[in-house]
Amino acid sequence: MGDELAPCPVGTTAWPALIQLISKTPCMPQAASNTSLGLGDLRVPSSMLYWLFLPSSLLAAATLAVSPLLLVTILRNQRLRQEPHYLLPANILLSDLAYILLHMLISSSSLGGWELGRMACGILTDAVFAACTSTILSFTAIVLHTYLAVIHPLRYLSFMSHGAAWKAVALIWLVACCFPTFLIWLSKWQDAQLEEQGASYILPPSMGTQPGCGLLVIVTYTSILCVLFLCTALIANCFWRIYAEAKTSGIWGQGYSRARGTLLIHSVLITLYVSTGVVFSLDMVLTRYHHIDSGTHTWLLAANSEVLMMLPRAMLTYLYLLRYRQLLGMVRGHLPSRRHQAIFTIS
């Protein structure tokens, strides 16, 4: 095929994850000869697509350079791991680390042309969804925690205990693992095309936009997107209430304040996380109604997976270090003294 790619279509797809766009990975005969899938004309220069792996690798390296150290710092300190405003961000760090490692595994299998078994594909699909769902739910919990502390301080003191944060984290992972897993495996069971494909692991975030995907597949991923935007609406409402309360009390107008910094940092991060779902939804609608061609569809999926999905995960660690001075001091204690001057805080 030279310098072009012809990705093999797969019946059941998942979001978010890496597209397998490798020229040396052979398509199965059934998929290659099946022109009804409408993907035979998908030819994108591999030399151009490989450039997307460069920013993805840099963002992954930036995340792995500090994120594990920050996570260990929080979990090793007994006082920090009992406070919700440290434990919930630690859960986001854990979820993002899981996603980064899965992303690297998928990228390696794609670049190396490895063929993963069907069981491995299913496990990776569920793990990717669970990690992303845990991140969104953890952000929602952080905003609700801040909302209770600002709007209802008396209820907050009576409600939040040392064990409440751990129960919230356990509930987040329970929902993150059960809800997407049930919907994904239900769609896999319904999708008859899965039985006709080989063992190649292809995980394009196209959400059933290919012709022939069953109705249940579309309903499955639409339900997941609805939960995502429901959490986003709840976060936006809480942010507005927090902003109104801070402005009324005069905290917002006191030059630089911790409340303003916290709200700004979380607004930027949540916007970046949610933007991937927006791009995903737009791609689904435009592709399904044939408003974009297959080449544009492929580029949207690749850019969303390789850049947009990785950017907020790389920024989160460093923004939290700038926000929490105590946490920054603990992390700096693990670094050589000559590197301390390179890190500063805005708090």
Swiss-Prot record:
Domain of life: Eukaryota
Family affiliation: Belongs to the G-protein coupled receptor 1 family.
Subcellular location: Cell membrane
Membrane association type: Multi-pass membrane protein
Alphabetized PROSITE patterns for the sequence: G_PROTEIN_RECEP_F1_2
Tissues showing expression: Expression restricted to nervous system and testis. Is also detected in several tumors types, most notably prostate cancer.
Annotated glycosylation sites: N34
CC annotations in GO: membrane; plasma membrane
Membrane-spanning intervals of the chain: 52-72, 86-106, 131-151, 166-186, 215-235, 262-282, 300-322
InterPro entries the record matches: GPCR1_Superfamily_Member, GPCR_Rhodpsn, GPCR_Rhodpsn_7TM
Topology Cytoplasmic: residue spans: 73-85, 152-165, 236-261, 323-347
Matches recorded under Pfam families: 7tm_1
Organism from which the protein derives: Homo sapiens
Protein name per Swiss-Prot or TrEMBL: Probable G-protein coupled receptor 148
A Gene Ontology biological process term: detection of chemical stimulus involved in sensory perception of smell
General function of this protein: Orphan receptor.
Extracellular side: 1-51, 107-130, 187-214, 283-299
Chief localization: membrane
Single GO MF descriptor: olfactory receptor activity
